[in-house]
Amino acid sequence: GSRYPGFSTKKKSTSIESKLTLAIRDVTGQSTQLFAAVKTEPGVHATHQIVSFQLEKESFSDNTELLKMKLNAALPADIAVTSLEIADERFVASLAVKSCTYTCRIATDPAAALFSRPYTCVVTESLDLESMQQAAQLLTGTHDFAAFSNGRTKKSTVRTVETIKINREDQLIQIQLTANSFLRHMPQLLAGTILTAGKEKKTDRTTLTLAGVESA
């Protein structure tokens, strides 16, 4: 995700979608439309993205491993197809999403992120894990998360955050957010709110009020 402005953008030639579409065309000789389970944002690294597409010809229907190998050979080194299988012709990845999970990695010591800097946020301030856990608990559930988006959507901003898990191992902290779906920028803003609670070492229900979150 480091080199790309997201999965799908207006500048299609630089997006992950464009690279994958081009690889499919080069390998199969067919142009196709991609449907992604989640349209990731700039700098987001997707480890389990699901993409569906249709091919008219069945030249690879009996050998998906060969198609996967050829696609990976045609793709940039920082994009990879990890699994490929034939789905029901009615399956559309963008319509089949039940939930998605984002993970925010935080290092409290720059040395702890030496080999994972592109995927890790370095925060040198002292963080109070208990305050972060309390903020996470308040943000879990069904709320109007309008304040946690770029404000450009005309659709409902009510979302259900199913779980927020915070784990710490030495100088590394992971915030794992799972929701039925996320608004644009919502994962980053949720993680930022939890981080703020950890820095200030205090949190109560004003966390929701200050963030503009309303129970739905």
Specify the residue positions occupied by each region the protein language model found.
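Structured-RNA-binding interfaces characteristic of tRNA pseudouridine synthases
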Residues: 1-216
